[in-house]
Amino acid sequence: MVETIFPGIRVRRVTTPRLTANVLEREADAAADAVRTVVFVHGNVSSSLFWQPMMLDLPGDMRAIAVDLRGFGDSEPLPVDASRGVRDFSDDVASVIHELDLGAVHLVGWSMGGGVVMQLLLDRPELVASLTLQSTVSPFGFGGTAVDGSLLAPDAAGTGGGGANPDFVARLASGDRSDEPGSPRAVYRSSYVAPGFVSEHEDVWVESMLSTRTGVDNYPGDATTSDSWPGFAPGTRGVLNTMAPTVFDTSGIVGVEPKPPLLWIHGSQDAIVGDASFFDLNQLGKAAIIPGWPGDEVAPPQQMLVQTRAVLDRYAAAGGAVTELELENCGHSPHLEKPAEFRTALLELLGA
């Protein structure tokens, strides 16, 4: 059996009016008089476990907390209402912040978690002291949009729950710990980190991935049929549908006042979030992996980085302080792959 909790980390159950959440914190923080609190929010097919090395590496005058989103880790596997975008997740995180009486916190969101913390900034700006977006989903969701964020098809065909690989979902559900092609371990090695990166904690990261609850109410969610290529559109339930561009748009952070300082950190070899992501159905079509692709004029791959940079440029033009850091030889997980650079950038943002 894999020991998933690192020495110096303790597990806490936090019951709010919305859910019972699983929370990780540093043992030393229990009695500490923290000047700042950092709240880490994981991404899709992961959990708070991934944040442990960075939590332990933060200075002692900070409080470090990582929250499991519903349906991940050991938080309640409550259904996800995707008609609200990621608000089920962001409202859950806000409820934990409120229950722990943390006040304004420094939010760090990874991948889908970046979308969650952007949504939290939109809905509860008083809770956000700063915002760190690591390998974040675009402010216009995942897939199905032109560069300006407009929908390529009215129903956002090719996005949402129908885009998941059924074999991968089945392997998650069965607890597959092998390194076979398509297994969670293989996906971690090929997509979560850059080629050649090796972690002594890989078994823990695989356990984290395997904590993902599967099904139409959780991961990946449901789907509907579409007359547009590739024949499906988002449903209204489950994780992948929360990031469908029909329901997800956090570009409104440009109008938030006051604007907290913002850090966007990402790897140059990110296989999941990029301008030619092979997790984007349109990119798979362009590469002839999915047949029948109607072409760039109808279904171009999403320019995720271009979109994010454009929104953050507007955020800066409207008075916000924005720092972008792209790390070379780094994939989707800078906090694991380039921890020193990540830590330095985060502490600079926090003024520590």
For each predicted feature, which ranges?
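Hydrophobic beta-strand anchors of alpha/beta hydrolase catalytic cores
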Residues: V38-F40, A64, V108, L262, ...
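Catalytic histidine-centered segment of alpha/beta-hydrolase-like enzymes
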Residues: P291-A299, C330-P339
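Conserved hydrolase catalytic core segment
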Residues: D57, D61, G103-G149
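Active-site loop/oxyanion-hole signature of alpha/beta-hydrolase fold enzymes
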Residues: P17, A30, A66-M112, S138
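Glycine-rich His-Gly loop
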Residues: A28, F40-G43, S111, T136, ...
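Alpha/beta-hydrolase fold catalytic core
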Residues: M1-V38, G60-M62, L102-G103, T159-G161, ...
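Alpha/beta-hydrolase
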Residues: L151-Q307
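Conserved HGGG/HGGXW glycine-rich cap/lid loop of the alpha/beta-hydrolase fold
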Residues: N22-A82
